[in-house]
A protein has these predicted regions:
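Positively charged, small/polar-rich N-terminal and surface patches that mediate targeting and assembly
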Residues: 1-101
Length: 101
């Protein structure tokens, strides 16, 4: 199993919708059983600029993390689909153990 996480800006869009929504829809269409989007309350990126949830941050500068737990085949299919759209999306793919106790 893999944890596939995408780190995007809340202002990023694709196909006339927020990118986090598009990622969730595309994963669902491939048969991924679930996914979640999480909005950051604060952070900084590669340029070192601090972003926080304040009145002045209403321009959509905060990060959104979209993640899925899926097998290798689905992870590869989702990544390939995203590559086919020539997007600039940072991701992490980690091997994880998942279960229910």
């Amino acid at each position: 199993m893999n944890l596939l996480s995408f780190y995007i800006s809340e202002k990023q869009h694709h196909a006339d919708m927020p990118l986090y929504e598009w990622l969730l829809e595309e994963a669902k269409s491939l048969g991924v059983h679930g996914g979640s989007a999480f909005r950051a309350i604060a952070g900084f990126g590669r340029h070192g600029h601090m972003h926080e949830e304040t009145f002045f941050e209403l321009a959509g500068e905060l990060a959104v993390k979209v993640e899925f737990i899926l097998d290798d085949a689905l992870a590869d299919r989702l990544l390939e689909k995203i590559r086919g759209h020539n997007m600039n999306v940072f991701y992490l793919k980690q091997t994880v153990e998942a279960g229910v106790v």
